[in-house]
Amino acid sequence: MRTHIALCFVCLVGCSKPDAQKPKETIQAAVSEQTDQCAPAAFDNLLRKYVVNGRVDYARLKAAKTDLVAFDAYLDRVGRCDVSKINGLEHYAFWVNAYNAFNIKGVLDAWPIQNIKAIDGFLDKKQWKVGNALLTLNDMEYKELIPPHKDARAHFAVVCADLGSVPIADRAYTAQNVEATLDQKAREFVKDPRNFSVDIPGKRVRVSMLFSPEWYEKDFLADTRFKGKKAVEYLVPYVDQETAKFLASGDYKVEYIDWDWSLNAAG
């Protein structure tokens, strides 16, 4: 990123006429403005105000015209963000925020609804402008987020506006908090019996469809930090010692819990 900025500066100095040269402060301001387009401050404010116990108060947000305008302005900046200039944890956080933000936007556009399946093509057909490209929610998750980072914890962070997903965070993801928040969401996942439970005497594990071969088993197995044989062993770092030992043994039958597509609406 620093190299790219430096090259751009050289081009400006070498190719511009003397009276067209911009002062250093102007160039720095332009770079700062471009970075701000990718920043999630406005989305963070919205989440803190409208997320209640992991659910979104869509009805209240829909009625708040000023906040809706601010939200749309944030989404417009996301659409114009030059994602080639962000990387690492900032890149990770950007795509989680984009996914969650456009989920909320999709629900607001279709409000009132009770189930996201009421929106035709919500995940795989409807496109949103992100980083000057038109992408579906599935594109954001499976092309921009999971492959480059190979971190399956993303499945605990992206929330497709339903109760099957881990409750949405009440703050935006940033380069500074993404690691800690991902681990927090993983711990929330294993503590919810709707997502995960074990019957040690009965040698049985019940876990969300997220871990099934039909869904995202391959993402957990491909995670660069994972060393187990069964996808469910991915949860070992987030459970108590007895459960961790049981999962690591591999001596159990895995059953997958049906996904709850009901809207994650507060109230």
Which residues does each PLM region occupy?
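Sec-dependent signal peptide recognition
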Residues: 2-8
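Interaction/scaffold regions that mediate signaling and macromolecular assembly across diverse proteins
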Residues: 18-267
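C-terminal motif of bacterial Sec signal peptides marking the signal peptidase cleavage site
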Residues: 12-14
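Processing junctions and N-termini across compartments
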Residues: 9-10, 32
